[in-house]
Curated annotation (Swiss-Prot):
SMART domains from the UniProt entry: ACR, DISIN
Role noted for this protein: Sperm surface membrane protein that may be involved in sperm-egg plasma membrane adhesion and fusion during fertilization. Could have a direct role in sperm-zona binding or migration of sperm from the uterus into the oviduct. Interactions with egg membrane could be mediated via binding between its disintegrin-like domain to one or more integrins receptors on the egg. This is a non catalytic metalloprotease-like protein.
Signal peptide: 1-18
Name used for this protein in its record: Disintegrin and metalloproteinase domain-containing protein 2
Subunit record text: Heterodimer with ADAM1/fertilin subunit alpha.
Residue ranges constituting the Peptidase M12B domain according to the UniProt record: 184-381
Length: 737
């Protein structure tokens, strides 16, 4: 059973999210005024990418070295709902060029996360102390207020020790270096419920900026993982909540995931988070462990108690995200991080200053990132800084625009879906473009085909009824047999050797025989090899010859003429075998070689001109998994034949056109279990009965059972005695007679 992770709060005495001096939430703070001075700046295309500031704190000068950190995509939108309940994007403009993170010169364990949009606003973290900085609004100069943030310790533990999901005490700890050569990206959608929206500002611009600060802090903490958290979109429930936000975090997470799967289809995102405000709460968060990239479980709930700092809220979010990547809580006796408090230590919520991931967390992340469960972190979103003003009517969808059909394009559909002067939806329209938007500017019904399968390794997608955009383009899982079991599917294409030959030489060509490959690819010259190195042609090992240069059979009498290439002919065993040779460095040179994923033997495929075992494809879709009536898609979900229903193609429905839980025509809310059980971590001690209280209960039950047995036995004995007495009496009477 998957683990549902809950974070116990105990945060009733932490500082408020936005107020620098909330009564009773912090130690006495010394607020001072400082004037930051910009001393260096590096620009690119008209905007700053690196900047250095000098400022004084308590009379001492510190140097802040900052680098621009983008986390907003160009199509970032903030959504809310109008009076009719229809979700609309808010007309706000956001800058993606003024968010920076860096360090304090001379302090290796320091961290700075600030926005420079309107002055400096953010957090400065030393080893064990944090400072908040923000512009002094009443000042005509560049004055800022700076104050020390010192959250008090909570009166209670953050977790019940018996419930804590710590790693095995025998867990082997190794020193893991961050994988800085590989970048990872996580796209999240954040929903702010009504009370949370009112608590942190009650204004769309103010709340949006605070969420930006939250993501900035989160990204700074995740820097050792080389992970960038992208805020793909933001949603405000300003008038009413779309789901009930009462109850414990377990049930709230279930409701949110159910709502997410039915209604949250805005744009591609990997995880969705619901931020909920409560005066007091036993828990501060919930998520599923290790399920970050599972669409059905990729979500979390963060409960924001009345008194909590922005720093602590960022730690809550980071811990939830880490848990969803399978990163466990630290054993403080064996895990180290170089700073007083590590990120995955529950006490991190109570501390100030820099918090880093421990060696244990780094190893957990390293294991997760090489597993199939991390596939959603591999795609890189476009993060071009949005510093240009949007121009309505230029035909480009820019920041703040819902649609832009150009100078003449708005007349294509009667009536026009897009207002050409505002680049917003026209009155009465619910969509403008996309394959799931009909001619009357309304969303197509759920289940209408929007992307047919283009070949046997592709699958169909349908409109989901809530978005004008067709579902993500899914395809058959890599490794599935195709072309009459001769080849396999790779990235949605049947990797057929015969088709490679036809693509290169025309319809008169076919895939070469083993004799052709063995003969030509053993020569290590222009006619055949396993690639080219700086020293010449690469030799093919006998087992790799089917993966070297592409060798085809040619069945026409016409002479082949290829532009910029030499065609090599060879008569081998009565077959005309041909290959191709481009000049070194030619843009088409890859076509000379057999493609990766081409079958080269039983259970083997080509990879980098070598014939290797196909186990690296991780193909595990047996016919039994989909009950012989479907195939697995690239999410490893069954895509069922017509009339057979997902998720396992076992049940049937006559009108079902086929598909999977990802196709857009399936009610995916059913995939969430009706009940989730808290298996570990952060459960209140008062929520369960101690064992010593249960023992007397069982003793009483046993005593009652014993008494009932004794009474029953006694009554039975009395009946036997009465029966014996009556028999004796009757016997005596008969003898007298």
């Amino acid at each position: 059973m998957w683990l549902l992770l809950l974070l116990l709060s105990g945060l009733s005495r932490l500082g408020g999210l936005s107020e620098p001096q909330t009564e009773g939430t912090r130690e006495k703070l010394h607020v001072q005024v400082t004037v930051p001075e910009k001393i260096r700046s590096i620009t690119s295309e008209g905007y700053e990418t690196q900047v250095t500031y000098s400022l004084k704190i308590e009379g001492k000068t510190y140097i802040l070295n900052l680098m621009q950190k983008a986390f907003l995509p160009p199509n970032f939108r903030v959504y809310s709902y109008d009076s009719t309940g229809i979700m609309r994007p808010l007309e706000q403009k956001f800058q993606n060029i003024c968010y920076f993170q860096g360090y304090i010169e001379g302090y290796p364990n320091s961290m700075v996360i600030v926005s420079t949009c309107t002055g400096l606003r953010g957090v400065l973290q030393f080893g064990n102390v944090s400072y908040g900085i923000e512009p002094l609004e009443s000042s005509s100069g560049f004055e800022h207020v700076i104050y020390q943030v010192e959250p008090k310790k909570g009166d209670t533990l953050l977790y019940a020790e018996k419930d804590m999901d710590l790693r095995d005490p025998q867990y082997k700890i190794r020193s893991i270096k961050p994988q800085r050569t590989v970048s990872h990206y996580l796209e999240i959608h954040i929903v702010v419920e009504k009370q949370m929206f009112e608590h942190i500002g009650a204004d769309t611009a103010v709340v949006t900026q605070k969420i930006f600060q939250l993501i900035g802090l989160t990204n700074a903490i995740f820097a050792p993982f080389n992970l960038t958290v992208i805020l793909s979109s933001l949603e405000f429930w300003m008038d009413e909540n779309k789901i009930s936000t009462t109850g414990d975090a377990n049930k709230l997470l279930y409701r949110f995931l159910k709502w997410k799967q039915s209604y949250l289809v805005l744009r591609p995102h990997d995880m969705a988070f619901l931020l909920v405000y409560r005066d007091t709460t036993d828990y501060v968060g919930a998520t599923y462990q290790g399920k970050m990239c599972d669409k059905n479980y990729a979500g979390g709930v963060a409960l924001h108690p009345k008194a909590v700092t922005l720093e602590s809220l960022a730690i809550i979010l980071v811990q939830l995200l880490s848990l969803s990547m399978g990163v466990a809580y630290d054993d403080v006796n064996t895990c180290q991080c170089g700073v007083p408090i590590c990120v995955m230590n529950p006490e991190a919520l109570h501390s100030s200053g820099v918090r880093s991931f421990s060696n244990c967390s780094m190893e957990d992340f390293s294991k997760f990132i090489v597993s199939q469960s991390s596939h959603c972190l591999q795609n890189q979103p476009h993060l071009q800084p949005s510093y240009k003003m949007a121009v309505c009517g230029n035909g480009e969808l820019e920041e703040g625009e819902v649609c832009d059909c150009g100078q003449e394009g708005c007349d294509d559909k009667p009536p026009p879906c897009c207002n050409p002067t505002t680049c917003q939806l026209s009155e009465g329209s619910t969509c403008s473009t996309g394959s799931c938007c009909d001619a009357s500017c309304n969303l197509k019904a759920k289940g209408e085909l929007c992307r047919p399968a283009n070949q046997e390794c592709d699958v169909t997608e349908y409109c989901n009824g809530t978005s004008e955009v067709c579902e993500e383009d899914f395809f058959v899982q890599d490794g599935h047999p195709c072309a009459e079991q001769k080849w396999i599917c790779i990235n949605g294409t049947c990797q057929s050797g015969a088709q490679q030959c036809r693509d290169l030489f025309g319809t008169d060509a076919d895939y070469g025989t083993k004799e052709c490959y063995s003969e030509l690819n053993s020569k290590s010259d222009i006619s055949g090899s396993c690639g080219i190195t700086p020293t010449g042609y690469k030799d093919c090992a006998p087992n790799d010859r089917m993966c070297g240069k592409l060798i085809c059979i040619y069945q026409s009498e016409d002479i082949l003429k290829m532009r910029s290439a030499i065609v090599i002919y060879a008569n081998i065993s009565g077959q005309i075998c041909i290959s191709l040779e481009y000049p070194p460095g030619h843009k088409e040179s890859k076509k000379m070689c057999v493609r990766d994923g081409t079958v080269c033997g039983s259970g083997k495929v080509c990879l980098n001109q070598e014939c290797v075992e196909d186990t690296f494809l991780n193909y595990d879709c047996t016919p039994e998994k989909c009950n012989h009536h479907g195939v697995c898609n690239n999410k490893k979900h069954c895509h069922c034949e017509p009339t057979y229903l997902p998720p396992d193609c076992k049940n049937t429905e006559d009108t079902w056109p086929g598909g999977s839980v990802d196709s857009g025509n399936q009610q995916r809310a059913e995939s969430i279990p009706a009940r989730s059980y808290v298996a570990s971590a952060y459960r209140s001690k008062s929520a369960r009965w101690p064992f010593f209280l249960i023992i007397p209960f069982y003793v009483v039950i046993l005593v009652l059972i014993g008494m009932l047995v004794k009474v029953y036995s006694q009554r039975k004995k009395w009946r036997m005695d009465d029966f014996s007495s009556e028999e004796q009496f009757e016997s005596e009477s008969e003898s007298k007679d």
